[in-house]
């Protein structure tokens, strides 16, 4: 019985390719409990049969054999030796262990939490840090007031201890978590991270706080005046709120975009400030106020007055005394104040445009997943008409591993726990079930009862190994009730559906269903893309209409240019000189003009030929008066046709004002008797 239940040698060799090497066989028990290894279900021959240990009698990925041919014994694949499996178990496709939270993974999550915050958890943490820093700053201000100095100083001392420990620990954690990025790996990478401006500020704040706490005595944070000067470094903690520097980047981008306007306004305003201060100084340098003091004793006093005036502050400490100085000050103030107020408007409009641009970018970014889904579904609809096997591989269920066949009883609770953990990881990473692009369902079929194999009974597994039925043969393994009564009731209540594990098991109704599902997914993706393309503001609608009108006008002008180039301008809108210039061009109008000129020349030549023929006829009639026939008016005689008497019939010719026909220009042929 033992020999019958064990697989053959060749088959055991093939199954051994999907297992761990000898150094990792200690995790075999874990592999039986957690069958979550990656499998090549779409690669290799027969849709991944190289790595899937399927029993010869089970409906696995092997293609069905002919009814008359016996089942061939399993043969090891000759695709070459197995690649080395010295990879980490988290990335190796031969590993049977579930991915664990390694050090690099924890580093990445901590780094994203601290340096690239996204989500409500990160917002709560960083907002709490901002509130703590703000409270510390408020107590620092209160410690300089005599009324609250005693209470604020004692409270601030313990707050400083907590903040120093907190920020020091956070700095060390940031330095450690930066190792998840390639440019911050190792000692030199950590030094590169520590050289960042915000990291330098954090280090200065921590060191300054430690110096303040170490030098202070008797619970007094500000023991000496020197330490009181270092205390102002605590204001740098407010920069800790915006570690990413988004506000500074936004301000820099606005200033860079409007740099030309800002430079122009500041330059003109500075010139107005210098000139107004100088002329006021010349007018007020000898003036004395009511207290007997000279207001503008130096040019520096005039510059101070100019800065206070043109910036609309107006302290009133220096005022012009003479009417000349007041007139100069009023004239230059109106001019200079207008230019000094322009940068505020320029920066305000720049910020508004930047915010609007970001909103449009967000609206455009929402269209990218919808467009990707539409392209993917359209391609799948197109690929559904292709009989290639790769089109249908995504609907094939991966074949079970060998340890799932050998397991004594199913464990549905395990799968539920794994699904919950997976959902939790996806939720932590910011992926919600509604944001997934497209789900590919697996196809199952409802086979007859006699085709169902018992994967939970060892006898059923042994019978499938001992006997390899063909397509027409049916294996009837006996079901062994090794489970409890409650589990048997659960198994009886569920409908067992055999998953399709090979392309050859797909039927026409399966393919038709797949086509219908793909077509429905295409229509849904198309509707979502159309909804994402809708403008979100009235200004966008107006801009779209104006942009469309501009494109229409450009196309109309291009069409008009091509028509003028091919047909030419109408004769009513061009002069004689332009007509003469247009004659040498290749337009249709120029060609028609040349054709008309040629027709006119041809008419003139034909008229000349007709006159010459009439003259010849008249001369011929005058030289043969006795040839017979009645004479014409004017002494001309009418001759007989050449066919009878050898003369030309004048009735064949028309008057000189008409064109001759083809018969008139054709010379009559002589008969055979006339030639002789």
UniProtKB/Swiss-Prot annotation:
Changing residue 397 to W: In LQT1; uncertain significance. Residues 143-153, 219-226, 284-299, 321-322 are extracellular. Residues 655-664 have a biased composition (Polar residues). Changing residue 609 to A: Does not interact with AKAP9 and the kinase A (PKA) catalytic subunit and protein phosphatase 1 (PP1). The keyword Amino-acid biosynthesis does not apply. Changing residue 316 to E: In LQT1; loss of channel activity. Phosphorylation at Ser-27 by PKA; increases delayed rectifier potassium channel activity of the KCNQ1-KCNE1 complex through a macromolecular complex that includes PKA, PP1, and the targeting protein AKAP9. Changing residue 137 to F: In LQT1; uncertain significance. Residues 535-572 are annotated as: Interaction with KCNE1 C-terminus. Changing residue 258 to N: In LQT1; uncertain significance. Residues 588-616 are annotated as: Interaction with AKAP9. GO terms for biological process: action potential; adrenergic receptor signaling pathway; atrial cardiac muscle cell action potential; auditory receptor cell development; cardiac muscle cell contraction; cardiac muscle contraction; cellular response to cAMP; cellular response to epinephrine stimulus. It comes from the Eukaryota. Changing residue 239 to P: In LQT1; uncertain significance. Residues 300-320 dip into the membrane without crossing it. Changing residue 527 to N: Decreased interaction with PIP2 and calmodulin/CALM in the presence of calcium. Decreased interaction with PIP2 and CALM in the presence of calcium. Increased binding to PIP2 and CALM in the absence of calcium. Changing residue 393 to M: In LQT1; uncertain significance. It is found in: Cell membrane; Cytoplasmic vesicle membrane; Early endosome; Membrane raft. Changing residue 526 to E: In LQT1; insensitive to gating modulation by calcified CALM; impaired IKS current. Changing residue 305 to R: In LQT1; uncertain significance. Changing residue 360 to G: In LQT1; loss of channel activity. Residues 623-632 have a biased composition (Gly residues). Changing residue 593 to G: Reduced cell surface expression and moderately reduced potassium current. Changing residue 283 to G: In LQT1; uncertain significance. Mutagenesis experiments were carried out by expressing in Xenopus oocytes or COS-7 cells KCNQ1 mutants either individually (homomultimers) or in combination with both wild-type KCNQ1 (mut/wt homomultimers) and minK (heteromultimers). This is Potassium voltage-gated channel subfamily KQT member 1.
């Amino acid at each position: 019985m033992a020999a019958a239940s064990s697989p053959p040698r060749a088959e055991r060799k093939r199954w051994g390719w999907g297992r761990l090497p000898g150094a990792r066989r200690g995790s075999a028990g874990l592999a039986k409990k957690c069958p979550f290894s990656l499998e090549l279900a779409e690669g290799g021959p027969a849709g991944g049969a190289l790595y899937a240990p399927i029993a010869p009698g089970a409906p696995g990925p092997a293609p069905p054999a002919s009814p008359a041919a016996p089942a061939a014994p399993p043969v090891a694949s000759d695709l070459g030796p197995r690649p080395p499996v010295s990879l980490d178990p988290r990335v190796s496709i031969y590993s049977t262990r579930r991915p664990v939270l390694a050090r690099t993974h924890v580093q990445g999550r901590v780094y994203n939490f601290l340096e690239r915050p996204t989500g409500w958890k990160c917002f709560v943490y960083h907002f709490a840090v901002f509130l703590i820093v703000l409270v510390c700053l408020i107590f620092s201000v209160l410690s300089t007031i005599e009324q609250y100095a005693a209470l604020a100083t004692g409270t601030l001392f313990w707050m400083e201890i907590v903040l120093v420990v907190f920020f020091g620990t956070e700095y060390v954690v940031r330095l450690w978590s930066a190792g998840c990025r390639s440019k911050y790996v190792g000692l030199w990478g950590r030094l590169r991270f520590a050289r960042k401006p915000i990291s330098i500020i954090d280090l200065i704040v921590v060191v300054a706080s430690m110096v303040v706490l170490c030098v202070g005595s008797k619970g007094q944070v500000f023991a000496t005046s020197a330490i009181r000067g270092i205390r102002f470094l605590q204001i740098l903690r407010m920069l800790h709120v915006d570690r990413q520097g988004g506000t500074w980047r936004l301000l820099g981008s606005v200033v860079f975009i409007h740099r030309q306007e800002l430079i122009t306004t500041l330059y003109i305003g500075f010139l107005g400030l210098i000139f107004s201060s100088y002329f006021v100084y010349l007018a007020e340098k000898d003036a004395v106020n009511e207290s007997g003091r000279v207001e503008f004793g130096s040019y520096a006093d005039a510059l101070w007055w100019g800065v206070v005036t043109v910036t609309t502050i107006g302290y009133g400490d220096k005022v012009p005394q003479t009417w000349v100085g007041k007139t100069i000050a009023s004239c230059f103030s109106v001019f200079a104040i207008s230019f000094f107020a322009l940068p505020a408007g320029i920066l305000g409009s720049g910020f508004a445009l930047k915010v609007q641009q970001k909103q449009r970018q967000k609206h455009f970014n929402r269209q990218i997943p919808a467009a990707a889904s539409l392209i993917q579904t359209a391609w799948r609809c197109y690929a559904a008409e292709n009989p290639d096997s790769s089109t249908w591989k995504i609907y094939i269920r991966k074949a079970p591993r060998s340890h799932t066949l050998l397991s004594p009883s199913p464990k549905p609770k395990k799968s539920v726990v794994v699904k919950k953990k997976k959902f939790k990881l996806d939720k932590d990473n910011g992926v919600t079930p509604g944001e997934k692009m497209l789900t590919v369902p697996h196809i199952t079929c409802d086979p007859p009862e006699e085709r169902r194999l018992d994967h939970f009974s060892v006898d059923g597994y042994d019978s499938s190994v001992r006997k390899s039925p063909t397509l027409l043969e049916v294996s009837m393994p006996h079901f062994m009730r090794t489970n409890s009564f409650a589990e048997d009731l659960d198994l009886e209540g569920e409908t067992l559906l055999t998953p399709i594990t090979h392309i050859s098991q797909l039927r026409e109704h399966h393919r038709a269903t797949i086509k219908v599902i793909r077509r429905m997914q295409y229509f849904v993706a198309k509707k979502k893309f159309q909804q994402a393309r809708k403008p979100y503001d009235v200004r966008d609608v107006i801009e779209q209409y104006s942009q469309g009108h501009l494109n229409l006008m450009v196309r109309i002008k291009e069409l008009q240019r091509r028509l003028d180039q091919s047909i030419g301008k109408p004769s009513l809108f061009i002069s004689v000189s332009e007509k003469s210039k247009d004659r040498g061009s290749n337009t249709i109008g120029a060609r028609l003009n040349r054709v008309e000129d040629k027709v006119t020349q041809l008419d003139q030549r034909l008229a000349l030929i007709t006159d010459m023929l009439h003259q010849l006829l008249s001369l011929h009639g005058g030289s043969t008066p006795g040839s017979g026939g009645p004479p014409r008016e004017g002494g001309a005689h009418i001759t007989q046709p050449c066919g009878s008497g050898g003369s030309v019939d004048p009735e064949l010719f028309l008057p000189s004002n008409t064109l001759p026909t083809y018969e008139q220009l054709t010379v009559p042929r002589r008969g055979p008797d006339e030639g002789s």
